Amino acid sequence: MEWSSESAAVRRHRGTAERREGQAAASHPQREASAQEDARGGGRMRGRTESGGESRGAKTALSEARTALALALYLLALRALVQLSLQRLVLSRTSGLQGEFDARQARVYLEHITAIGPRTTGSAENEILTVQYLLEQITLIEEQSNSLHRISVDVQRPTGSFSIDFLGGFTSYYDNITNVVVKLEPQDGAKYAVLANCHFDSVANSPGASDDAVSCAVMLEVLRVMAASPEPLQHAVVFLFNGAEENVLQASHGFITQHPWASLIRAFINLEAAGVGGKELVFQTGPENPWLVQAYVSAAKHPFASVVAQEVFQSGIIPSDTDFRIYRDFGNIPGIDLAFIENGYIYHTKYDTADRILIDSIQRAGDNILAVLKYLATSDMLASSSEYRHGSMVFFDVLGLLVIAYPSRVGSIINYMVVMAVVLYLGRKLLRPNHSNSNYVRDFLCGLGITFISWFTSLVTVLIIAVFVSLIGQSLSWYNYFYIAVCLYGTATVAKIILIHTLAKRFYYVNASDLYLGELFFDTSLFVHCGFLVALTAQGFCSAFMSAVWVAFPLLTKLCVYKDFKKHGAKGRFIALYLLGMFIPYLYGLYLIWAVFEMFTPILGRSGSEIPPDVVLASILAVCVMILSSYFITFIYLVNSTKKTILTLILVCAVTFLLVCSGAFFPYSSNPDSPKPKRVFLQHVSRTFHNLEGSVVKRDSGIWINGFDYTGMSHVTPHIPEINDTIRAHCEENAPLCGFPWYLPVHFLIRKNWYLPAPEISPRNPAHFRLVSKEKMPWDSIKLTFEATGPSHMSFYVRTHKGSTLSQWSLGNGIPVTSRGGDYFVFYSHGLQASAWQFWIEVQVSEEQPEGMVTVAIAAHYLSGENKRSSQLDALKEKFPDWSFPSAWVSTYSLFVF
């Protein structure tokens, strides 16, 4: 196949010369009229005239090398601007000034909290040491407070239960957990309050600096500054330091449903983390109550917010949740949800330490929280917030400099105005009644088809590569080096898109001028983005503003450079003006794309064994390339050739593919400056299975191993040969959750696990489970009452037999909630001390069941203290390579049939 555009031009030139010999009688005025018609039609005529035959000559075509270099440098320059904005954490420094937030003091709080160590609910570290430290600091703050303010402190120990549809759905029960609550109010009291929420507990085996000790440190310092301020408050500010968020949002539920101060709350700010440091992103607001977004816009000193992030998070794509849900669903209170999102690779690991959080990250978070709380605590809207509960908001920041926000209904009007502008622009071309227009309509429709074909084939191409890489065991090769994904999947997408359009240019649009085709494919890209804009707006997505940006600015650019384009052709001046007009959509597009990959890339390292991460990442990358390349398609039709570009992209992709297949890129890293560990859960388990008569029918013990990513144990086996496929765990078909002690109902995400035989364990505080009573109810159901005692964390599982249904129970709202797979899952936890857990379930039985009506199991999890360790567990943990993070604890599993 010949790739050079000059050769096609030569052939057409030769054909034109032959036709010219047979048309010697043609007059000069006729040729002039033909040239004018050619200009009006964009140089588009199938039967070429003299003027059209030279349209792809060297005079009009752009240089391939220069154009490719210009586009590459343009994108790199925009990426540099994005990176610059992300590295600039604070716009102006106020730390240390009187009445301002002091990040140095907040860091002192942070270091004291993390020095306590991992703080799981129910542990002495969480329930005693951390609580004591918080109360000591609050007392000091109270002593230094201004006489204008009054501080009240309460330590709440709630007990309760609720159901949640997170992770497929389950029920939660908590007993005697801890909340430290502080109310700052005027001396004469206040009728209304704004809530600030953080949690001081952590997951097992992690110091939890970013999640969420730094937020509690920020809140302590905000409390200190506000308490010492001579400025009077109109409303109260309630600071909730909750001690059981990692237990799936239990402490916030205990506060909002049981604490007497909860009735005062009219709005809240929740501080969370999905990464370590960087900027804190506003990723949820509402529901409704646009005045809250306006409060953030007006008050925040270092804004960072996106309605796109809100809609992505609320779609459920990200396997995470925050206390925002509890306050929204159980308190019916609007709020703002903020979270650190950078460097999620070390989130919930041993590397989540205080020294990794930059002082500027603390400063910007403190400045923002202090300013917004002050604004809300002195706002008239807080008292009558229900009057402002209407509609949602479109909001987004501009490189962290400012936030733009407007009501979604206004956004819809703007979006449809942009759509109308496109309709008018394209309508003039598509509906013009002449011969050249009929060709344009046909070419436009074919252009749409070619665009979609290029996207579809490029997506199929990268998916084939991703599936192959996954099948040969080289998944996550890009996890430690993200540029590998760009070189493998990004280049493949770009190459395929360019190839499809080059083939269309050579074999379909044979006699069309370059300028005509450049304009045609700009119009098709504009139309596609306009289609997305209409669809998103019609569905009520606030993130449709992005499509509006990608339609409005390119359209304005086209209208501005059109005359220059027609007069001078595709020259360097045209490229400069065109790229300048695309500056805003491409800059903001790259800004959002950074956020997408910053969030999703680490998540793919902990998304379970069933989702091929390469397939997900390749798809996301392909979509991003399609968006970014959409308005660059024009240049494929304006350059003199694409041969070198395609060959370069194929070469980069092929070399990267070979290196990936050879295993040259290891996914994980123990680099102390930027660790990217593999996550592994180790549980030393003792299992006991009873039959209907209560006899033990099976007993075993071992170390149950779960890898939290798609690679399983393939990278671990060379270091620990005993962990291999011969010890793959087998599902106990008749047991709830396959007969293993799942801490949370994530069994559908992790189906590959290993069970290494090990001696039986005997915790000092063993779990006890018994049937208290069994009674037949008047409505022909059986009520079973149970009692359980054990460690601070337990899980209760239920599976009904054929002919039986679980009709009600004493948990949650009384209606049993099934988990994914049909079993029932109850997550239980208690504080430092708790009475026996007694509850009942009611089973509806259609007929007598010889094998029983229900199978139940209880798992005990020892996450703290001496009981969490065993010599075998410690020995195995030590064998794991330094690029891994094995989180280990002891569990028991006991099954009963009734």
Swiss-Prot record:
Widely expressed, with highest levels in ovary, kidney, hypothalamus and hippocampus. Within the ovarian follicle, expressed in granulosa cells, but not in oocytes. Present in both preantral and antral follicles, but not in atretic antral follicle. Residues 1-66, 415-451, 502-515, 563-573, 637-645 are cytoplasmic. Zn(2+) 1 binds at residues 199, 211, 272. Gene3D superfamilies: Zn peptidases. GO terms for biological process: cellular response to oxidative stress; endoplasmic reticulum unfolded protein response; ovarian follicle development; proteolysis. Binds 2 Zn(2+) ions per subunit. Residues 88-393, 473-480, 539-542, 595-615, 667-898 are lumenal. It is found in: Endoplasmic reticulum membrane. Its EC number is 3.4.-.-. The chain crosses the membrane at residues 67-87, 394-414, 452-472, 481-501, 516-538, 543-562, 574-594, 616-636, 646-666. One of its GO terms (cellular component) is endoplasmic reticulum membrane. The active site is at residue 245. The keyword Protein biosynthesis does not apply. Its cofactor is Zn(2+). Zn(2+) 2 binds at residues 211, 246, 348. Belongs to the peptidase M28 family. This is Endoplasmic reticulum metallopeptidase 1. The gene is Ermp1.
